[in-house]
Regions:
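N-terminal cap/lid segment of alpha/beta-hydrolase-fold proteins
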Residues: 1-10
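Active-site loop/oxyanion-hole signature of alpha/beta-hydrolase fold enzymes
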Residues: 6, 14, 44, 51-91, ...
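Conserved HGGG/HGGXW glycine-rich cap/lid loop of the alpha/beta-hydrolase fold
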Residues: 9-61
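Short N-terminal helix/helix-N-cap motif within the alpha/beta-hydrolase-1
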Residues: 32-40, 59-62, 125-126, 215-216, ...
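Flexible "cap/lid" loop of the alpha/beta hydrolase fold
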Residues: 101-105, 112-144
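Conserved alpha/beta-hydrolase catalytic His-Asp/Glu region
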Residues: 127, 132, 143-199
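Conserved loop-alpha-helix segment in the C-terminal half of the alpha/beta-hydrolase fold
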Residues: 204-239
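Catalytic histidine-centered segment of alpha/beta-hydrolase-like enzymes
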Residues: 239-248, 252
Length: 263
């Protein structure tokens, strides 16, 4: 299914099941099919599941002028209103988590039941005071290092075949061109959402990976200390960056417990 944003971008989305809504948001270069191991589980638990391809991703329209994460944040807001979603849970992976951080910052009055952010530091640029950013990038080096990317292995032990079978047809039909989307990645990297998390009054679970190639999971403990009433942290062992795929059973158990606690 598709809907058009206020600036004419067509967003491809799917709605599964009925019940309390859970919105799943993929990361940079991702596809909504990455959530295939969560969708069935959530439907069985009695939730309505909403997935979508962010602009410039998957089956959604390419925006050649995209150089900011803010349109992606607005897309989420418009999709929720278009579908008349009432008090959803938002679950985001990587840049999808940053879209949620931005949503919390821009739409403070939008009623949410809770948030799960998967392996995404709220500040990606490292400083002496904040050594919890993306790898070793700093304000001086981030453009060069993000452009090169290098031979970084995102996962610890690869992606399960049942996920690959869902992703590969989408990648063939709708290839993601990293070079064309570097302006978006650069803007994503420059953002600092720490103050947003410090001030939120919505239950927020930060899920980190002990073997993430990108982030030191200690960032989540630091953020939890700034807002212990509303921020919690779960670390998953034997996983790289794509936790919900690499350790689906562990992640789904964490997710299920969190959703039940905050319904």
């Amino acid at each position: 299914m598709d809907f058009k944003t206020s600036d004419g971008i067509r967003i491809n989305y799917y709605v599964y099941g009925t019940g309390k809504p859970v919105v799943l948001i993929h990361g940079f270069g991702g596809y909504q099919q990455i959530w295939c191991l969560q969708i069935k589980n959530l439907i069985q638990q009695g939730y309505q599941v909403i997935t979508y391809d962010q602009r410039n991703h998957g089956a959604s329209t390419r925006d050649e002028q995209l150089d900011s994460i803010e349109p992606l944040i607005k897309d989420l807001y418009e999709l929720l209103n278009y579908l008349n979603v009432a008090k959803p849970f938002l679950i985001g992976h990587s840049m999808g988590a940053s879209v949620i951080y931005g949503f919390l910052s821009l739409y403070t009055d939008f009623p949410l039941s809770g948030v799960i952010a998967i392996d995404q530091s709220p500040k990606m640029l490292n400083t002496i005071q904040w050594p919890y950013g993306y790898m070793d990038v700093t304000r001086a080096s981030y453009k060069l290092k993000l452009k090169e990317h290098g031979n970084v292995r995102e996962t610890l032990n690869g992606v399960p075949s049942q996920v690959i079978s869902k992703l590969e047809p989408e990648k063939e039909m709708f290839p993601f061109i990293r070079a064309e989307n570097l302006p978006l990645l650069y803007d994503h990297a420059k953002r600092d959402w720490r103050l947003t998390l410090e001030k939120i009054n919505i239950p927020t679970l930060l899920v980190t990976a002990n073997q993430s190639p990108y982030f030191n999971g200690k960032f989540a403990d630091v953020m939890r200390q700034t807002n212990p009433q509303f921020i919690s942290h779960q670390a998953v062992d034997q996983s790289g960056h794509v936790i919900m795929v690499e350790q689906a059973n562990k992640f789904n158990k964490i997710m299920d417990n969190y959703l039940k606690e905050h319904q």
